[in-house]
């Protein structure tokens, strides 16, 4: 399965990890210096959930991000799914 949230459309994107060396100025050094940057992939926090939709009277199984779960808790499952176009 793809790593995409069906509510928000969140998907993996590229990021960087920065490697630093040296002692911080606060600790008496001359400062931290960037020695290398490494490409990495940042993944969304996806959860596979069974959401109860009272209007339909059944569970709907979906792969959603943690932020989308908060949206469902705030606006209700039926309204959120209808707005996205899944119902």
From Swiss-Prot:
Pfam families according to UniProt: Ribosomal_L28
Record's signal peptide: none
Keywords: Ribonucleoprotein, Ribosomal protein
Annotated Gene3D superfamilies: Ribosomal protein L28/L24 (2.30.170.40)
Name the record gives this protein: Large ribosomal subunit protein bL28
Source species of the chain: Akkermansia muciniphila (strain ATCC BAA-835 / DSM 22959 / JCM 33894 / BCRC 81048 / CCUG 64013 / CIP 107961 / Muc)
Keyword Ribonucleoprotein: yes
Similarity comment: family membership: Belongs to the bacterial ribosomal protein bL28 family.
GO BP term, pick one: translation
InterPro entries: Ribosomal_bL28, Ribosomal_bL28/bL31-like_sf, Ribosomal_bL28_bact-type, Ribosomal_bL28_sf
GO molecular function term, any single one: structural constituent of ribosome
PANTHER family: 39S RIBOSOMAL PROTEIN L28, MITOCHONDRIAL, LARGE RIBOSOMAL SUBUNIT PROTEIN BL28M
Gene that this sequence comes from: rpmB
One GO term describing the cellular component: ribonucleoprotein complex
């Amino acid at each position: 399965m793809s790593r995409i949230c069906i509510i928000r459309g969140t998907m993996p994107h590229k990021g960087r990890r920065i490697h630093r060396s040296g002692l911080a100025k606060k600790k008496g050094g001359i400062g931290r210096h960037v020695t290398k940057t490494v490409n990495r992939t940042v993944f969304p926090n996806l959860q596979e959930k069974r959401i109860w939709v009272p209007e339909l009277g059944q569970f709907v199984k979906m792969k959603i991000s943690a932020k989308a779960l908060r949206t469902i808790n705030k606006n209700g499952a039926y309204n959120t799914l209808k707005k996205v176009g899944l119902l």
